[in-house]
Amino acid sequence: ILNYFKNEDLSENIAFIESIDDKNDEILIKYYFNDVNHKTKILLDNEVAIIKHSKIRQYDLLDKVFLYEKRIWLKLKNDTKTLDIFINSQKLKLVFNDRCINDLSLVLKVLAKQKKQRSKNSNLWLFADMSWRADDNAEHLYRYIMQNHPKQKTAFILSKNSTDYLRLKKEGFRLVDPKGFYFKYLIYKADKIISSHIDKYIFNALGGDTLKTKDFIFLQHGVIKDDLSRWLNQRKIDTFITSTKAEYESIAGDFNHYKFSTKEVVLTGLARWDALIKNNVLNTKQILIMPTWREYLSGKVQKYGVRARNSEFVKSLYFQKWQEFLCSKELEKLAVRYGYNIIFTPHPQVKIYLEDFNLPSYIITSYKESMQELFCKSSLMITDYSSVAFEMAVLKKPVLYYQFDKDEFFAKHSYAKGYFDYEKDGFGEVCFNYEQLLFCLKNILNHNDKKKDSCILISQNICKDIFKKCKL
């Protein structure tokens, strides 16, 4: 605090051993500082240590930099005894598990214990999208591995009540219900958990240390464009998939709020993009309306991540603005005049409120068709802040953003505005009111819009690239 308000040096010079990577014999050390030009010297057994990965994480207070955190991954040898860290020639105290230590004997004991625990893992990879729904990156990567690497032991976590369950079972997926004891047994035995989400039912399946000696590969649900650090920093992520250079740098780079570095973050693209590009359909006449959710409108969390209904939802600006647009005569006239079908598929959390919208009969609301099919068969998308716009950018199809609640959205969500500027970096016009949205939509249908080029570079073998990263 004194450093922030009076620009005084940090008086407590301590380095912490935060984490142990028992698979690679590496430890994560961190310390805090305010002088970005400070000099660091790290010695292992009196020899200059080789830094495997490093990161400068930034903490802000009142829109100003509060302090910095240096995060460094070091490689240990079996007989490493001492670790000495110097900042501007001043030696730092070393703390591990809330204890000051003079050598690495305790660290090596914990390392050996974790190795022993990891040795009990079988070569099983557990996949998951949402507990009650598939059709995301985990499904696509699982299918690739099932078809191209059949010897790899795999299982896919999915509720028996899911509408995707029978479809995947017929295809040959090995499915396990998250409510059963067998699911917990497989979590215990698995070596890798590979998921597009970071749900508690996985991370806490066997208690807080469920994934301590297992690899968690985060496939992501979409492309991160906002600052999700407050949420994601709570999780242990061993491999963090990203899709664009800007996204990669915003997470793995220095002077941001994420704890993750080049050790965890990799740039591959999303697993589902292989099939997306392959199955793209041109010259269609379909408008896909796909707004994201507002977490602050959610009901209480029930088991397995399912939300209860919020009785106040219909009073929200979100409901009122989308209903105004969807039920407008102007939208219907445009659809009829230009011969377009309109599909309304909002975030899955909206599904329980669909009847409240009282939509006209010509608007289709179906969750039976896969997300992939919707993107491929649609000719343009209307969304708000959702990263699904990147799917259309990959397919080089136009997007409109409807952001009537811009200030409220970023003020109330668990994440802050990130590197992505919708007006500068987005894939189409940003509209802030109903009239502007209709005007921009008419321009696109009239072919009077100015198309924005997508800067997304796509690999031809994304699933193959991710599989290689999972094998590491």
Locate each region found by the language model.
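Basic, ligand-binding patches in group-transfer machinery
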Residues: I1-L126, K151
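Active-site and donor-binding regions of nucleotide-sugar-utilizing enzymes
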Residues: I29-D63, E69, K116, S122-L276, ...
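Conserved catalytic-core segment of nucleotide-activated headgroup transferases in glycan assembly
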Residues: D135-P150, A271-D356, E429-C431
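Donor nucleotide-activated moiety binding/catalytic core segment of transferases
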Residues: V176-A190, I343, P348-F390
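A donor-sugar binding/catalytic signature common to diverse glycosyltransferases
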Residues: S195-K200, K214-F218, E369-H413
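A short, gly/pro- and small-residue-rich
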Residues: A205-I224, V306-K315, K397-E408
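Catalytic binding pocket for nucleotide-activated donors in carbohydrate/polymer assembly enzymes
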Residues: S261-T262, E355-S361, Y385-S459
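C-terminal alpha-helical cap of glycosyltransferases
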Residues: I462-L472
